[in-house]
Amino acid sequence: MKVKLINFRQVGLKYECFALKMLQDRDFNDEKQFKNELEQLKRFNGLVHDHLVTLLATFTLDKRYYFLFPYADSTLEQYWESVKSPKRDLSTAQWVSKQCSGIMAAIDSIHDPKHLQNLGVRGYGRHGDIKPDNILWFQSSKDPRGILVVSDMGLSSFNRDTSRSNIPNTKIPKVPGYRPPECDIEGGTISRAYDIWTLGCLFLELLTWWLGGWELVEKFQEARKSVYITGAINNIFFHLKKVKGRNEYVAQVKTQVTNVSSRKLFQVS
């Protein structure tokens, strides 16, 4: 959708294209999903923090639900793939550090929304789906390297103080990839710590890209692949290990993850 060039508040971004998101039948219950995502986008957006995506408009057409957003140049994973060999210099290190800090601050504004508390609304949010596909890269007039923005509030939630840490894991979709151990442990509960785990996974892959480019990211993703207790192959960051002599399992971070964390696995100098 091409339109006249406009200026927007969010960190000096300029848009001449927009992204239109349509909820598909697979997106749970369309109306329920639409209302939840709309409420979260009203609470948490680029007007609250520069590293959160901004909802521009919503509408329904032929019983389908639509969201209108600024058009991103790429997702974070697409950015990694396009910039295959980033420079390992001070300037790039500062940019990576700045983006990590900005993403952390954006998530903190969801976890501890002081802008809502100042309005008398008491509660705590959780994003619930942090992954490279949901981190968008935008060009910016304020930074020649662009800016990373957290998007997709479809799985996010907002809870009152009393319920912020006791949501049963049976009530959330079991997303692959970055999901934390509490998703798979019987009786596990979901809290804001869910986002902290997924942030750690994201930042580890981001640093892997900076240290070794897209090739190293692919190697790391491949190295994490293992057979899960269900028999399926996945590349999540942990595995479940049966406790000897007992009918229960404990979660452990995969050796491949701790190795790359200490730069052993691929001998990055």
Q: Which residues make up each language-model segment?
A:
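Short beta-strand micro-motifs within the conserved protein kinase catalytic domain, predominantly
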Residues: 54-65, 73
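ATP-binding glycine-rich loop module of kinase domains
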Residues: 2-35
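Conserved C-lobe activation region of Hanks-type protein kinase-like domains
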Residues: 184-264
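Structural motif at the C-terminus of the N-lobe alphaC helix and the adjacent alphaC-beta4 loop
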Residues: 40-50
